[in-house]
Amino acid sequence: MADCAACHTGAGGTLSGGRAFKSPFGTIYATNITPDKTKGVGDYTDDEWVSALREGVGRGGKHLYPAMPYTSYTQMTREDALAIKAYVMTLPASSDAPPPNDLRFPFSIRFLMVFWNFLYNPDHRFAPDTTHDAAWNRGAYLAEALGHCQQCHTPRNFLQGLKTGQAYAGALQQGWMAYNITSDGPTGIGSWSEADVAAYLRTGHAEGHGAASGPMAEAVSYSLRYLTEADAQALARYVKSIQPIRTTVLPAPTHVAEDELGARIFEGACASCHRANGTGAQSAAAALAGDYTAADPDATNLVQIVVNGGKLQTQDGALVMPGFGDGYTDTELAAVANYTVEHFGQRAGHASPGLVAKARGSATPKVEQPGA
């Protein structure tokens, strides 16, 4: 549930590190957290491990950067933190060393994190809300601590601190839009049932709402698909209780002119899997009708998927969407993205060749996801 593998898995294997994360201040590389005693965390004491997870301070007082979600893990119990450590120590060790971080001055000075932590890391444990029952509190703990959901779904300020007053209202992360998951109807998941949310978490798909892609697909593949039914229901219950925050409302569906170039490309490259009517040929996850991403005029996530593809690993096997970045021009891919929004969302798409070019540039090296 803590989803360590999604960030720390690299070319050297599970938790070997090396994955790059771009920030406004430069690039941060995930560390090796395998049991290797030289390059990894094999000789960390329990106290050092817990300090790193909950306080963002590693061995020798070395401050971590908040690409590591310790501002959420700070709510984790010591028992859960040490359970993660016990599991990590059973995995194969790797001697891989990630590249050094490439951060601009003065952000390269780790000591400055003392002041950042003073502002943005509360360093407190999860406290149950006695006005709610045990299931709701279990869901709150999973979302706020272990699952660190706010780290992607809450917008950040200019110092990259979470804007807690806009919790779960959606944010752009690594070139992908983490959508509004508050209970707002038009712009959040107010129309989703708790069963829809639970199914989405465990399978990466909710009928009539769409399939997970990008970082959310990784979260499902590496972590959320292993949720027990009870935990998925608890998490869904908590998420559905989040106070609504209204963000940008999608335009009302209307008849719009469809991109002719995009229509031709869709027929030749997309319809065999997604079908012309968007119902999906081989899997419900391939359905475009009703999919929020396919109806979003900004087309941020849609363009990422079209250019770079994606993979969703479920308990029943892998669902793979190939990327088309190598076979089509920026203009052609923008056209097919706009056609998709226009045809299935009945809204004018705003994908541009520039957005496609940006998606090409944001692609990260593919790391093989776990098997079923």
Provide a role label for each language-model segment.
Residues C4, C149, C270:
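Short cysteine-rich clusters marking metal-coordination/redox-active sites
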Residues V41-V57, G61, A83, G190-E194:
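Aromatic- and charge-enriched surface segment that lines or borders ligand/interaction sites
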Residues G10-T27, R59-A140, E144-A145, T154-W176, ...:
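Flexible coil segments in periplasmic/lumen-exposed cytochrome c-class electron-transfer proteins
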Residues I28-P35, W176-T182:
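Acidic/histidine-rich, surface-exposed loop or edge segments in extracytoplasmic proteins
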Residues L261-T300, Q304:
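C-terminal structural cap/anchor segments
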Residues K37-K39, S72, S183-T187, S221-L224, ...:
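Short, recurring structural edge motifs at helix starts
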Residues M1-T9:
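Mature N-terminal segment immediately following signal peptide/propeptide cleavage
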Residues L201, H205, A289-E332:
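Extended, polar beta-sheet/loop recognition surfaces of beta-rich domains
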